[in-house]
Amino acid sequence: IRDRVEETADAVKVGNGSVELIVPKGKAFNIQSMKLNDGEEMVVPSTNAIPWVLTYKGIQGENPMLFPEHGVYKGYDVIQNDTSASVVFVWDMRLSYEKRMYPIRMKVTATDHSELLYWDLTADLPKGWVISKAQFPRIAVVRPKDGKMITSAGWGNEFDMATGGAYKVTYPSCTGSMQLLLMHNGEGSFYYATEDRNACGKELRAVCGSKSVTFVTEVVTSEGWTDATTGRFDLPWTTVVGYNPDGWQAAALQWYRPFTFTCEWGNKSLQSRNIPQWLLDKDLWIRSKGVTDTVMAAINKTIDFFGEGIGVHTYYWHNYPYDTHYPDYFPAKPEFEGMISTIQKRKCHAVPYINGRLWDPAADSYTALNGASASCRKADGTLYTEIYPTSKVLNTVTCPASSLWHKIIIGLADKIQNELHTNGVYIDQIAAAAPQPCFAKNHGHAAGGGDFWYKSYKALIDSIRGNHLRKDNIVFSEENSECYIPLFDMLLTVNTPHANCRIVPLFPTVYSDRVITCAYTYTPTADVTKGEFRYQNMQCFLYGSQLGWVDPTLLMRDEAKTEATFLRTLMELRKKQHDIFIEGRYIREFVPGGDNPQIDVP
């Protein structure tokens, strides 16, 4: 395969024999043809007049949202070398009455031996201007017959596509563990992904029309992406598209999985990460709520039934009610240290909950420590404020770049380990909640979005791991955003959506050999005997996740003996398969045929 650019009187084509893009010559940009995988036509002609939308911010407060029609289309330039060929499409934008224009350049590249097309964007700006938001690329492709959309929410979600439907991935978060979308039917899969090795916050979206589906990435930019000296804006990643006739799993394995090994979060094996052996050997977790005689009795009964080696994820141990007064957890409830000791004497492990993201503005510490100085700020200076049904109090989102917040979380990690003698600490929401643009001027990062969110959390957890985590202790977090995999010993995977979709094994297809996960989804909160508990743990087992994460007061009820026995049998089976579950590869989902009994699970 050899990449090349071909020009005719009517059009320009960039391709390599496997993929090609044809754009007609003329006064306006559009796509005549985009063929992927040796000839699979992907576009309806003349449906791609708007490949980008950019919002500018000028020095006087100008704030235009500009489309290609607001500029002058200048055609294209050609760039070729020994390994790739690119066509750079150019629009001149008039942003002032200076003689010069300010071009936007969209580069589409074909490389040797690749079945993908690569899309990049740059723009020139007047001095002091920035681009504050970007939609790029915007690519409308043919809607396939009986098409389905797969997003990377949690384990992965598959949706029946509906006209007018919008399918979104907010990355990195529980709704977007990876930065890709897959549209497929029985004939193959369209692949759309950003190759961002810095895990910048972004939204990938597919909007379904009657004949076409528009894929777009939308981002609140970082002002640091505009060079103050040159006035040049660079979108700091490449977007790729492809088509795989072997389906969505083949696309993920052939293109996305290799990309992850080029990222700092994807190139580390489990063996290289110094994970305590007791966690590698773990098969079962329970989730205790509270510090009472009833809870402790249920924990002991669980250990009696399942044996030693259970992990106990402890909640409601702190001084105030759950989801209130964060981060003022201490003093712990008086009986909690004894509870930890009892669990450990029975050769099990206990790891308590804290939140790594929220600061209650009514908490004593928010006033005493000037928590407002650490809060994440919107562009208008106000706070991101959230209310959870568990508490119905205000919680503000804290910027992870704040040095004050680092000091608080590190202090909590120290105190929990040194005073309560736990087996580590669980820090909620870090690998689950999406980044927020921050415009605070005192946090040491450029205003807006960008990579500061991920890199700030990485610096925080690296500091805990390198200087504060006691020997053989663990730190883990909620959900499975890919960039956080090597920061945490384990990820608690419970937030995959269920409504109007099917859960599919996209995440284990890509990452099963480089991550330890616990659970499959939230277990029942009132009754484990209705069928869903067994289904959840079956899926947990099949996806390679550590089992359970169940309330022991429910599991140890007399009426739940069938469920407890099922879970113990599954645990004993899993215990014999650690060579598969630790660094093993998830191959594919297999549904056995035959006359198998079926039950309806509510």
Question: Which role does the model predict for each range below?
Answer:
Residues 76, 83-86, 99, 118, ...:
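Conserved structural scaffold segments of CAZyme catalytic domains across common CAZy folds
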Residues 334-337, 341-342, 349-420, 498-512, ...:
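Active-site-adjacent "subsite" loops/lids of carbohydrate-active enzymes
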Residues 14, 18, 117-125, 602:
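Short, well-ordered beta-strand segments enriched in hydrophobic/aromatic residues
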Residues 311-334, 365-400, 433-458:
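Aromatic- and acidic-residue-enriched carbohydrate-binding clefts of CAZyme catalytic domains
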Residues 343, 404-466, 472-483, 535, ...:
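Active-site and adjacent substrate-binding regions of carbohydrate-active enzymes
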Residues 85-146:
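Acidic, contiguous internal or C-terminal segments within carbohydrate-active enzymes
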Residues 218, 231, 235-237, 453-602:
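Active-site-proximal substrate-binding groove within the catalytic cores of carbohydrate-active enzymes
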Residues 9-98, 157, 250-253:
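Acidic-aromatic substrate-binding/catalytic surfaces of carbohydrate-active enzymes
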